[in-house]
Amino acid sequence: MYTAKTAVMQAHSVGMHMSREQIADALIEASEGLIENVYYKSETTLPFKADLHQENGFLRGHDEGNVAVENGLKFHIDWLRGQKTGFFVDQRENRSLLEHYAKGRNVLNMFCYTGGFSVYAMRGGANLVHSVDSSAKAIDLTRANAEMNFPGD
């Protein structure tokens, strides 16, 4: 996945937090130019007893937009205020798999968040896609992502 040349990093341990600068440098170096910015989003994930008072922010670079491209589909990503790192990249294979099963079917995407599964189902030829989330912000994000990929549909 490509997110506007930005990697979002999240630490869940004090050790990873203490190594964040080296990890950011390694991400940039290993990406061979694909990553220029590293956003650190660990304000709420670090152990509270460690008393680190970490605020979210850029370790390297700056905000260059928030559109990710995955398998030719575009997604608005809100890594600043969104859930976790903003987009669940571990679901990439599952989204792609759904695309192959969607043709001619009705699809219900519960807890849609960015609408990733919905957008893949649409591209896969689903007859109807329902996207459900308790968050109005998530529904707006899903609509925006569907419109960006399928204008006028």
For each feature predicted by the language model, list its residue ranges.
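Non-catalytic accessory regions of SAM-dependent methyltransferases
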Residues: 1-4, 105
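Rossmann-like S-adenosyl-L-methionine
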Residues: 60-153
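Short, histidine-centered active-site or binding-site loop motifs used for metal coordination
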Residues: 4, 13, 81
